[in-house]
Amino acid sequence: MSYGPLDMYRNPGPSGPQLRDFSSIIQTCSGNIQRISQATAQIKNSMSQLGTKQDSSKLQENLQQLQHSTNQLAKETNELLKELGSLPLPLSTSEQRQQRLQKERLMNDFSAALNNFQAVQRRVSEKEKESIARARAGSRLSAEERQREEQLVSFDSHEEWNQMQSQDDEVAITEQDLELIKERETAIRQLEADILDVNQIFKDLAMMIHDQGDLIDSIEANVESSEVHVERATEQLQRAAYYQKKSRKKMCILVLVLSVIIVILGLIIWLVYKTK
């Protein structure tokens, strides 16, 4: 398995600014979250080799690059989520609800992926510190330097000179070990800085979730307001229909009464003319 940097997780694209819509940002964020999860599993697998026979400078270098690349991917996703929150809302209430559900699901997935990634980051940091502690405990530099100072006081024979040369070689090896320790300490400082970056992302995510809650309240208020208007309109239509029906009924009664009156008047007139 390769433990190289996260090049395959990078999203190629033009260097110039791009106008992105809601769907494209959602798709990019979803892909990034999946890649963060995949990289976390890869880091965890590499971490299991630290402190074993498979441990090497190359492994540690690749692990550091992979971890840092994943951290950058998380920061990129965080910025995309901020951009997502700045997009104008659609006019349709149903579309607003759909977008809100998509954003909720996306932020939940991102939070879960970040939790797993940060847990692995901290475990890698612990293992690196344990490895440095073991290396320092096994270092012979202090004792050998003390022996070297004693030998520098006097060496009267060729045997003492050869012994001194041998000790110089051992000291040189130990200094190389210490150089590796310094490199690991630098890597740990970078790792801890990346962990702090993830902490900041969590804070930003919490703020976005809070804003999302305010947005949900606003949408629900708009929905309730729309429902009230619909109910009022329905009630008014029902009243209008009732009054219209009542008016028609009165009109029918009036027409019927007028018809009866006309008939009666007609009969009276007919009877009058008939008697004459």
UniProtKB/Swiss-Prot annotation:
The chain residues annotated with the modification Phosphoserine are: S139, S142, S218, S225
Is Phosphoprotein found in the keyword set?
A: yes
One GO biological process term: vesicle fusion
Name the residues that span the membrane: 249-269
One Pfam annotation reads Syntaxin_2
Modified positions (N-acetylserine) in chain numbering: S2
Predominant location: membrane
Ranges in a coiled coil: 33-131
Q: Which UniProt keywords apply?
A: Acetylation, Coiled coil, Endosome, Golgi apparatus, Membrane, Phosphoprotein, Protein transport, Transmembrane, Transmembrane helix, Transport
Q: How does it sit in the membrane?
A: Single-pass type IV membrane protein
In its keyword annotation, does this UniProt entry include Protein transport? Answer: yes
A cellular component term (GO) from this record?
recycling endosome
Q: Name one GO molecular function term.
A: SNAP receptor activity
Q: Which residues form the t-SNARE coiled-coil homology domain?
A: 178-240
InterPro entries documented for this protein: SNARE, Syntaxin, Syntaxin/epimorphin_CS, Syntaxin_N, T_SNARE_dom
Per the entry, what this protein does is:
SNARE promoting fusion of transport vesicles with target membranes. Together with SNARE STX6, promotes movement of vesicles from endosomes to the cell membrane, and may therefore function in the endocytic recycling pathway. Through complex formation with GRIP1, GRIA2 and NSG1 controls the intracellular fate of AMPAR and the endosomal sorting of the GRIA2 subunit toward recycling and membrane targeting.
Which family, according to UniProt?
Belongs to the syntaxin family.
Subunit and partners = Associates with the BLOC-1 complex. Interacts with BLOC1S6. Interacts with NAPA and SNAP23. Identified in a complex containing STX6, STX12, VAMP4 and VTI1A. Interacts with GRIPAP1. Forms a complex with GRIP1, GRIA2 and NSG1; controls the intracellular fate of AMPAR and the endosomal sorting of the GRIA2 subunit toward recycling and membrane targeting. Interacts with NSG1. Interacts with TPC1. Interacts (via N-terminus) with VPS13B.
Q: What is this protein called?
A: Syntaxin-12
Q: Which organism is it from?
A: Pongo abelii
